[in-house]
A protein has these predicted regions:
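C-terminal helical subdomain
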Residues: 180-183, 199-243
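Conserved glycine-rich Rossmann-like NAD(P)H-binding loop of the short-chain dehydrogenase/reductase
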Residues: 29-46
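The beta1-alpha1 cofactor-binding region of Rossmann-like NAD(H)/NADP(H)-dependent oxidoreductases
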Residues: 40-41, 61-72, 104
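Conserved glycine-rich cofactor-binding loop
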Residues: 15-16
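Active-site helix of classical SDR
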Residues: 122, 158
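Residue(s) in the substrate-gating loop at a strand-loop-helix junction
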Residues: 142
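Substrate-binding pocket helix/loop in short-chain dehydrogenase/reductase
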Residues: 98-99, 106-108
Length: 244
């Protein structure tokens, strides 16, 4: 994976699940990874593990709903390593509920994290990448960007937005690669903030067939490792036995 070695890769939502697995895998292949999330105690442990394995990693607290926070995170990556090659906008939440539960605060929070979080990452990194003449955005969408499920209407809408933003940016870019990663059901902390029983029941049903985070990390590695003239636009990764 020679096209991964020495690349500077910033990852949001890196304190667990897909973000953690991806950071460890990319570092194993020689990338310089910068981990961002709110839970810095978890980030510190992950970075220590990467260092103990001979990898290069840094971390910084970031709230992806804050444009200033995300800019500071990307600027930190550039300060530490001199450039930014890949921004993986991975942070997301999924408080499932039926629409008539009217969990309006949860809707707004989901929109802020899942949509604005991606836009903030793009806003922070795009001018730097354009000045460099190269770069790559990887954005976590979901199979929920391609199908709608009961209790997941708003979540699906946010993930379709991620897909649409990614596709629009791809069409507008000549030398910036854009990749959408659309996971199926993965065994992570996603959904731990569900407050409604209907949403909890739906998640249990979904997770009867699920992947481990490393399966998605492998997809990210594949997208990053391609030659610079090759843009993997979207990778959908489902369990083999997935019914959706």
């Amino acid at each position: 994976m020679s096209n991964v070695e020495n690349k500077v890769i910033a990852i949001t939502g890196a304190s667990s699940g897909i973000g953690e697995a991806t950071a460890k895998l990319l570092a194993k292949h020689g990338a310089k990874v910068v981990l961002g999330a709110r839970r810095t105690e978890k980030l510190e442990k992950i970075v220590a593990e990467i260092h103990s394995s001979g990898g290069q990693a840094e971390f910084k607290a970031v709230d992806v709903t804050s444009r200033q926070d995300v800019k500071a995170f990307i600027d930190f990556a550039v300060e530490k390593f001199g450039r930014i090659d890949v921004i993986y906008n991975n942070a997301g939440i999924m408080p499932l509920s039926r629409i008539n539960d009217l969990k309006i605060d949860e809707w707004e929070n989901m929109i802020n994290v899942n949509i604005h979080g991606v836009l903030n990452g793009i806003a922070a990194g795009l001018p730097i990448m354009e000045a460099q003449g190269s770069g790559q955005f990887i954005n976590t969408a979901s199979i929920a960007a391609h199908a709608v499920f009961p209790t997941a209407a708003v979540y699906c809408a946010t993930k379709y937005a991620v897909w649409a933003i990614s596709e629009g940016l791809r069409q507008e870019s000549n030398n910036i690669r854009v990749t959408t990663i659309s996971p199926g059901v993965v065994e992570t902390e996603l959904g731990s903030d569900i407050s409604q029983e209907s949403g909890k029941d739906a998640l249990k049903a979904f997770r009867k067939v699920s992947l481990q985070p490393d399966a998605i990390a492998q997809a990210v590695l594949y997208a990053v490792s391609q030659p610079d003239y090759v843009d993997i636009n979207e990778v959908i990764v489902r369990p083999t036995a997935s019914p959706v």
